[in-house]
């Protein structure tokens, strides 16, 4: 279990590139020889659709099914995990997870249901990436309790960066009260358009202020129409536009993430959650 790292990719704001990051970081890690499971923890099923499952609501078994088995203290159903052509596994989601989100409030140890669902899978993977829903609701709390670390995608604009403080406080609270091992791997700047002075100013400010206590990844994901097209084809940017700037950026991010893990194994660094 110790060899698997669970990363929650989260931001309570929608449209900041969480799902795109989950897909492309996951495929990037798989391309470097890592065993990767992607977990869709959003009832909208964006990650599931992005990996080519066009009708997720027709799936017989999904994340919600497995979580219900944990709640009922029953064995997990087989056949939930789907193998994608780009060598990543997917634990899909559908609209049933919306009911699970509401139902968790009446469950004992409700914050631990997702953790108990995926803990048995850790032995089969090097990385498990959880694509969180755009809220700070009970499913996101479950993801943060299940995770070892967090990656926070954020656009370089006023509204996105304004919401960071709330998210950071929530992560810190979960660390103090429930999951003491939780740490922040870093903030990932997405949909970056360096042609605008506003974006440049926000990035500079973010790196000089928040970056004093929390890593801001060196890699920046540029804005690209090609990246937005990937979900329609059910593939990663590495298949859709292998030689493009977004693929290069996600390849660089993959290296940063694996370097973080290598350094963590070699020495115990300071905890960066405040």
Can you describe what each PLM-predicted range is?
Residues 1-274:
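P-loop NTP-binding core
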């Amino acid at each position: 279990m110790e060899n698997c790292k669970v990363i929650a990719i989260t931001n309570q704001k929608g449209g900041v590139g969480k799902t795109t990051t989950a897909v492309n970081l996951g495929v990037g890690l798989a391309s470097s020889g890592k065993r990767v499971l992607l977990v869709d923890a959003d009832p909208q099923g964006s990650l599931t659709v992005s990996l080519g499952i066009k009708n997720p609501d027709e799936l017989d078994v999904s994340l919600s099914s497995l979580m219900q088995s944990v709640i009922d203290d029953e064995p997990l159903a087989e056949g939930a995990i789907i193998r994608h052509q780009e060598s990543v596994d997917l634990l899909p989601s559908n609209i049933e997870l919306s009911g699970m989100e509401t139902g968790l409030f009446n469950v004992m140890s409700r914050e631990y249901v997702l953790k108990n669902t995926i803990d048995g899978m850790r032995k089969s993977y090097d990385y498990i990436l959880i694509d969180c829903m755009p809220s700070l609701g009970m499913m996101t709390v479950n993801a943060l309790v299940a995770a070892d670390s967090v990656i926070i995608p954020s656009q370089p604009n006023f509204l996105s960066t304004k919401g960071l403080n709330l998210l950071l406080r929530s992560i810190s609270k979960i660390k103090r009260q429930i999951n003491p091992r939780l740490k922040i791997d870093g903030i990932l700047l997405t949909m970056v358009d360096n042609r605008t002075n506003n974006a440049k100013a926000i990035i500079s400010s973010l790196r000089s202020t928040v970056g004093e206590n929390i890593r801001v990844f060196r890699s920046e994901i540029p804005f690209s129409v090609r990246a937005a097209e990937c979900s329609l084809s059910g593939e990663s940017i590495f298949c859709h536009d292998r030689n493009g700037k977004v693929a290069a950026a996600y390849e660089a991010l993959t290296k940063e993430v694996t370097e973080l893990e290598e350094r963590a194994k070699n020495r115990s660094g300071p905890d960066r959650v405040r």
